[in-house]
Amino acid sequence: MDIRKVTTAEVLPIRHLVLWPNKSPSFCEVEGDDSATHYGAYAGGKLVCVASVYNNGHEARLRKFATLPEYQGQGIGTKVIESLVRDLKRENVSYFWCDARTSALSFYQKFGLCVEGEEFHKSNVAYFKMSVSWEQEPQT
């Protein structure tokens, strides 16, 4: 498996197929996509998992994290999150957060994210905000 940075155009089809197949493809576009960092995991040369990070200085937000159904449960998403977390820490991001579907809370907890606040809904799907704070590395 190979994890690398990819383009917005590459992530959109997987976002649509996995996250919102009953919506229009444009529903899967996010303001800020052009300046976001998009990660992709390839298995056998095929893009199978995507995640997008919107970095605002020392704060970063994960959005539109999706793995093709036939590749779920194989640890691919875990490796993508581990890779982007390493990058964020290297960039001295101190606060990382996402809106997590309630079905995925335990997945994000593996990376130290904790629930913040109350459950809320987007397009009839239940979510919680989850976040983690990291100590910044001293500048040398």
State each model region's role.
Residues T67, G73-R86:
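Conserved acetyl-CoA-binding loop-helix of GNAT-fold acetyltransferases
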Residues M1-A43, W134-T140:
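Short amphipathic alpha-helix that is part of the acyltransferase structural core
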Residues N55-F65, Q72, K122-Y127:
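A conserved beta-turn-beta hairpin within the catalytic core of GNAT-like acetyltransferases
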Residues L88-R101:
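Conserved GNAT acetyl-CoA-binding A-motif
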Residues G40, K46-Y54, R61-A66:
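Conserved beta-strand in the GNAT
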Residues R15, Y108, L113:
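Conserved active-site tyrosine of GNAT-family acetyltransferases
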Residues V80, A104-F107:
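Conserved short alpha-helix immediately C-terminal to the canonical SAM/SAH-binding motif I
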Residues D99, C114-V132:
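Conserved catalytic-core motifs of GNAT/GCN5-like acyltransferases
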